[in-house]
Amino acid sequence: MFRSFSTAAKQAVKGTYVQRAIVGGAAVVGIGASTMLYADSLTADAMTAAEHGLHAPGYGWSHNGPLETFDHSSIRRGYQVYREVCAACHSLDRVAWRTMVGVSHTNAEVRAMAEEFEYDDEPDDQGNPKKRPGKLADYVPGPYPNEQAARAANQGALPPDLSLIVKARHGGPDYIFALLTGYPEEPPAGVVLPPGANYNPYFPGGSIAMGRVLFDDLVEYEDGTPATTSQMAKDVTTFLHWCSEPEHDERKRLGLKAMIVLSSLYLLSVWVKKFKWASIKSRKIVFNPPKK
């Protein structure tokens, strides 16, 4: 009896040592992982503004409010800037012509714009390829047939597609506007740029293949708006923001409707609760003891 008790005690003590060893090992691993993460965070914080790019200031965009929508006149002007300036190098592969109808242009205007381009059609009976005018269902064509042609025309640099550029960059429209208007006359002293590169403090590393493209009176707006550099940058940024979020206005409308409906249902539920429970919560129970 004594021997069996001693064996059980030894096993219990051994199990305790094993548990302590596991807990100690887990603690060591946790401390090591925390130390590595802390060291990595210090390394990330050591990145300079020149390496990461100057942080773009915040601008008061008219569509930033919870109930504000896009300035559709600005979208129309922004498309004009894209067509006359940006379309020479950048594409809008994910934007269909039909999405512009009722947003920035009329149905007839968009049809006319689409018909200015030719798209591949089904081959004829002899198997020869054919071309056809663009339709509303087509997507905005790019300036180059493939990536190799784009790089060859831009000294090896690949101009990014602008369909989702606002959502794909930290800072969104603020970054795009700051980049377009942030080219200085000369790079700062001590900055050495590769051949063919341009200096822009908002671009990571400061060296960018794209030079300044917006200058005062570069385009002539249809509505007579003065085409200053900042105005063109604002308009094309608004247009690109719409390209990234074409559902922006509709989403806010649905959100407002949902808030109204949910608020009404909440107030109705409060009234029903008070109506149903008022008599129950305010009732009094009187106990009359029997007379002897």
Curated annotation (Swiss-Prot):
Entry function: Component of the ubiquinol-cytochrome c oxidoreductase, a multisubunit transmembrane complex that is part of the mitochondrial electron transport chain which drives oxidative phosphorylation.
Free-text remark on how the cofactor is bound: Binds 1 heme c group covalently per subunit.
Gene3D superfamilies membership: Cytochrome c-like domain (1.10.760.10), Cytochrome c1, transmembrane anchor, C-terminal (1.20.5.100)
Cellular component terms per the entry's GO annotation: mitochondrial inner membrane
Alphabetized InterPro entries for the sequence: Cyt_c-like_dom, Cyt_c-like_dom_sf, Cyt_c1, Cyt_c1_TM_anchor_C
Residue ranges that the UniProt entry lists as topological domain Mitochondrial intermembrane: 47-253
Region described as Disordered: spans on this chain: 117-137
Catalytic activity, as annotated: a quinol + 2 Fe(III)-[cytochrome c](out) = a quinone + 2 Fe(II)-[cytochrome c](out) + 2 H(+)(out)
Residue numbers binding heme c: C86, C89, H90, M210
Name this protein carries in UniProt: Cytochrome c1, heme protein, mitochondrial
EC number assigned by the record: 7.1.1.8
Membrane topology: Single-pass membrane protein
Subcellular location as annotated: Mitochondrion inner membrane
Example GO biological process: mitochondrial electron transport, ubiquinol to cytochrome c
Upper taxonomic lineage: Eukaryota, Fungi, Dikarya, Ascomycota, Saccharomycotina
Highest taxon of source: Eukaryota
Subunit record text: Component of the ubiquinol-cytochrome c oxidoreductase (cytochrome b-c1 complex, complex III, CIII), a multisubunit enzyme composed of 3 respiratory subunits cytochrome b, cytochrome c1 and Rieske protein, 2 core protein subunits, and additional low-molecular weight protein subunits. The complex exists as an obligatory dimer and forms supercomplexes (SCs) in the inner mitochondrial membrane with cytochrome c oxidase (complex IV, CIV).
Transmembrane segments: 254-272
A single GO molecular function term of this UniProt record: ubiquinol-cytochrome-c reductase activity
Cofactors required: heme c
Translocase listed as a keyword: yes
The organelle targeting sequence, given as a residue range: 1-46
